[in-house]
Structure formats: structure tokens, C-alpha cells
């Protein structure tokens, strides 16, 4: 079930509930919500859509684009790995597939 077409506020609340089911720590959930509202994520969301709020994104392809652009951002690799992990968790909430857990085909890894 894909949740991409529900209202942004419902996505935000649903994602928070999703996070709390994975880890019952409210500070953990709040930190993930904060990461999704960061300047970096807003800037990249604006690059791929007319929205600067990731919860307003209307296609899964745009979410994938945000994920990949965040992952490729090279100014602070460690920080962008954290952000891309949060975006991956959000994508899992939206459509059930977490990008960080996807297994690459053997031929893809070898170039």
C-alpha cells in the first residue's frame, strides 16, 4: 500500500507513529522528523519538485530522486549518510521498501 497521495500532515503524523513502532523512543522519532525538515532536505526537495516540504512530494520517483541527491551530496559525507538513511526510512513508510536495505545485483557492484 502506497501512502504518497495522503495529506502532508497525515504523512508527518503517520511517519512519526511508524518510527515509534520501530523504536519507542520519542526523542528518536523527533530527531528523524527534524532531519526531514532540515535545510538540506528542503533544498533538494525544491530541486526535484515545486515543494520544499518532503511531506508534500507527490510521486515516489521524486522521493527516490531526493534520496539519491542527498546520498551524493559531498560536503559532509557522514551527515548526508544519516540524512539519506532518514529519507530511506520515510520511503519505507510511504511504500514499504527501504532503500538502504536493498541488495545490489552482483553485476551492478562490479561496474
What are these regions (language model features)?
Residues 95-109:
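Short, charged hinge/linker segments at domain and secondary-structure junctions
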Residues 1-6, 57, 104:
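Hydrophobic transmembrane signal anchors and adjacent membrane-proximal interface regions, especially
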Residues 21-98:
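Non-catalytic DNA-binding core/recognition domains of DNA-processing enzymes
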Residues 2-29:
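Short terminal alpha-helical segments
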Residues 1, 110-111:
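Classical N-terminal secretory signal peptides
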Amino acid at each position: 500500500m502506497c501512502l504518497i497521495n495522503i495529506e502532508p500532515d497525515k504523512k508527518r503524523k503517520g511517519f512519526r507513529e511508524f518510527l515509534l513502532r520501530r523504536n519507542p523512543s520519542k526523542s528518536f522519532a523527533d530527531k528523524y522528523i527534524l532531519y526531514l525538515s532540515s535545510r538540506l532536505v528542503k533544498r533538494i526537495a525544491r530541486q526535484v519538485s515545486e515543494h520544499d516540504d518532503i511531506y508534500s512530494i507527490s510521486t515516489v520517483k521524486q522521493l527516490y530522486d531526493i534520496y539519491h541527491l542527498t546520498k551524493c551530496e559531498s560536503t559532509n559525507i557522514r551527515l548526508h549518510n544519516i540524512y539519506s538513511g532518514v529519507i530511506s526510512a520515510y520511503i519505507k513508510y510511504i511504500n514499504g521498501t527501504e532503500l538502504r536495505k536493498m541488495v545490489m545485483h552482483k553485476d551492478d557492484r562490479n561496474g
